[in-house]
């Protein structure tokens, strides 16, 4: 069911806020930490929305995907996202070398882009704010940079 004039609020610190907007106005607001990205939560939300739109209307899935916009807010970037060897190997194996920053750090944004592009999202329609919550801790809350005691940001989307 598609509601009119509905809003969604997402609270986050270092995790990735992802807002997916189909050309029809249907949207999803997704909280994606490393486990969510590994389990492709944003891509699954996109799949669900595309499937629903194609069932309800006579749309081509590939055309809808190609016109979908994805907005990514501030999150912990590759320079600051140190992982254990197990998580590092999992991401490189699953999403390719694009998400490998170095021997101990992975690029969550690259892993997400791999998933979205594989589903037909035009790379030019993926808008990443480009801000790291850890590097820019004077502007953003960071669970890691603030030793587990931090505030939260809000990502808000509304369909009018």
Model regions: which residues?
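Active-site microenvironment for binding and transforming phosphate-containing groups
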Residues: 1-160
């Amino acid at each position: 069911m598609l509601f009119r004039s509905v809003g969604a609020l997402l609270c986050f610190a270092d995790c990735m806020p992802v807002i997916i907007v189909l050309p029809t106005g249907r949207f999803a607001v997704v909280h994606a930490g490393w486990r969510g990205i590994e389990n492709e939560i944003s891509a699954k939300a996109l799949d669900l929305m595309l499937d629903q739109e194609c069932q309800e209307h006579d749309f081509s899935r590939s055309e809808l995907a190609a016109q979908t916009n994805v907005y990514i807010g501030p999150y912990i970037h590759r320079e600051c996202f140190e992982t254990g060897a197990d998580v590092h190997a999992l991401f490189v194996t699953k999403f390719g070398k694009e998400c490998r920053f170095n021997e101990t750090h992975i690029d969550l944004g690259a892993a997400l882009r791999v998933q979205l592009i594989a589903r037909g999202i035009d790379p030019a329609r993926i808008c990443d704010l480009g801000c790291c919550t850890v590097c820019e801790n004077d502007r953003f809350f960071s669970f890691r940079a603030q030793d587990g005691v931090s505030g939260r940001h809000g990502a808000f989307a509304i369909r009018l």
